């Protein structure tokens, strides 16, 4: 068996095209285009790359993208004041504060200061709570993007055993909630998990998000499993690899996400979908 690659680049382009058509229809109907505010604090090179791709993607679909770059020396009060200003701006549908924030800033406090209806990253406890209660609105971007990939490839989830490796607030925990909502029996593995291999060998759906290159041996993959690799790691050679040993895993899996070109593009596509949804559902006037 050789796994079929799940093409995140292709699906993300499809999602972007769908959103662009909705934006065009809005504007033709005399309504304003959705607005996204992207806030970057400091000059972290990786964050600058991510922010640049998000801003470009927004402009490509016809959003109004507003950039707010604060120096690394900015105070937490200055950031909270900016967020409050954006909360009250009727032209802004989504607020994205790029993480990580500089040391000394309270990330939880900053994320909680974003109005839940403008929380297009889906990190606010209110939005995570809605997902836990099976009434999601704005959903965490990477898990939402993964569900979109699985749906677009018509991969059945109901009744399947899903194993999630990694329990971060950004991917692992909301991913568990998404798969539970989709009808899976879920197992979440983390640093204290005993017999990781035993859990992985039982997975019909495996989602790995730990940030360690080739952390999961391909030989552990159950025959016919669906493998979603969220990791993106650069080796000393410069090559980008995921958290799963891809070459071996693809000989056992039925579907697998490559790195790069799998999950990554879907995170930005989900951000765009969330901003569109916030505009249509919460901020429809004008």
From Swiss-Prot:
* InterPro entries the record matches: Aminoacid_DH-like_N_sf (IPR046346), NAD(P)-bd_dom_sf (IPR036291), THF_DH/CycHdrlase (IPR000672), THF_DH/CycHdrlase_cat_dom (IPR020630), THF_DH/CycHdrlase_CS (IPR020867), THF_DH/CycHdrlase_NAD-bd_dom (IPR020631)
Is DNA repair among this UniProt entry's keywords?
no
A single BP term in Gene Ontology: purine nucleotide biosynthetic process
Q: Binding residues for NADP(+), per the UniProt record?
A: 166-168, 232
Q: Give its E.C. classification number.
A: 1.5.1.5, 3.5.4.9
Tell me the organism: Vibrio cholerae serotype O1 (strain ATCC 39315 / El Tor Inaba N16961)
| UniProt-listed Gene3D superfamilies | Leucine Dehydrogenase, chain A, domain 1 (3.40.50.10860), NAD(P)-binding Rossmann-like Domain (3.40.50.720)
Query: Which chain regions cross the lipid bilayer?
Result: none
Provide a GO CC annotation, any one.
cytosol
Family, per the entry? Belongs to the tetrahydrofolate dehydrogenase/cyclohydrolase family.
Q: Relate the assembly described in the record.
A: Homodimer.
Gene Ontology MF: a single term:
methenyltetrahydrofolate cyclohydrolase activity
CDD domains the UniProt entry points to: NAD_bind_m-THF_DH_Cyclohyd (cd01080)
> Pathway, per Swiss-Prot/TrEMBL?
One-carbon metabolism; tetrahydrofolate interconversion
Name the reaction it catalyses.
Answer: (6R)-5,10-methylene-5,6,7,8-tetrahydrofolate + NADP(+) = (6R)-5,10-methenyltetrahydrofolate + NADPH; (6R)-5,10-methenyltetrahydrofolate + H2O = (6R)-10-formyltetrahydrofolate + H(+)
What is the primary gene name for this protein?
folD
Q: According to its UniProt entry, what is the function of this protein?
A: Catalyzes the oxidation of 5,10-methylenetetrahydrofolate to 5,10-methenyltetrahydrofolate and then the hydrolysis of 5,10-methenyltetrahydrofolate to 10-formyltetrahydrofolate.
The yes or no answer to whether the keyword NADP is present is yes
Classification via PROSITE patterns: THF_DHG_CYH_2
* Name of the protein: Bifunctional protein FolD
Q: Which NCBIfam families does the annotation name? A: PRK10792.1 (NF008058), PRK14186.1 (NF010783)
Record keywords: Amino-acid biosynthesis, Histidine biosynthesis, Hydrolase, Methionine biosynthesis, Multifunctional enzyme, NADP, One-carbon metabolism, Oxidoreductase, Purine biosynthesis
